[in-house]
Regions:
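A residue-level marker of the well-folded mature domains of exported/periplasmic proteins
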Residues: 1-194
């Protein structure tokens, strides 16, 4: 019977697609149930810290328009994937832009937020060299293509083109839930901003 066969979850922990909470029933299906992957929260915390550290180390040049607002855009891979949820929360936590929802930082995409009024995020702040900067998530969206595939690099490349046209030099940092989307955004953005 299937109930006695080994079960291996690989790369994606079974979880609630809305909250990211682990599905313990699936993870403990039988005594031969395993998960092979990494700790999503630890990776997310590291990513958020690295983004924050980069901003602080490059503060003299990162605020491209000198408005005192460090604006970032965020490519979200899959709104129901535990890694995507964790990475979005990790960046928002590190930058102070996260808002609590049901006991965790909200990981929902915000659409656009140029005025800082989105309810899923808030303006954060960083003090560097005696000056306080506002940190604002200008836009975020799930990178899902028309066929329904998520984590889509081409969609991310198109998104940065749209965001760059809309926000111009308000964008100081580009953040992504994975390398493929991040590289696509970098390539499209750098081509448009020689």
């Amino acid at each position: 019977a299937n109930k006695d066969k080994p079960l291996v979850w690989f790369n994606r922990q079974p979880s609630n697609s809305s909250t990211g909470e682990l599905d313990m029933a699936a993870l403990s299906f039988n005594e031969d149930t395993y998960y092979v992957g990494f700790d999503a929260n630890q990776g997310a915390e590291l990513q958020g810290t690295m983004v924050k550290d980069y901003i602080e180390a490059n503060i003299d040049t990162i605020d491209r328009n000198g408005d005192g607002v460090i604006g970032y855009v965020l490519a979200i891979g899959d709104i129901g994937h535990n890694d995507s949820i964790a990475r979005t929360r990790g960046v928002r936590k590190a930058l102070g832009t996260g808002v609590e929802k049901d006991g965790s930082i909200d990981s929902e995409p915000i659409g656009t937020n140029t005025d800082g009024s989105a309810s899923a995020v808030q303006d954060g702040s960083l003090e560097v060299n005696g000056k306080t900067y506002t940190v604002r998530e200008l836009a975020s969206q799930e990178m899902k293509n028309s066929a329904g595939a998520t984590w889509d690099a081409a969609t991310a490349g198109n998104a940065i083109g749209t965001w760059s046209s809309s926000f111009g030099d308000q964008i100081d940092v580009v953040v992504s839930n994975n390398d493929g989307m991040g590289m696509s955004m970098f390539n499209a953005w750098s081509k448009d901003n020689d």
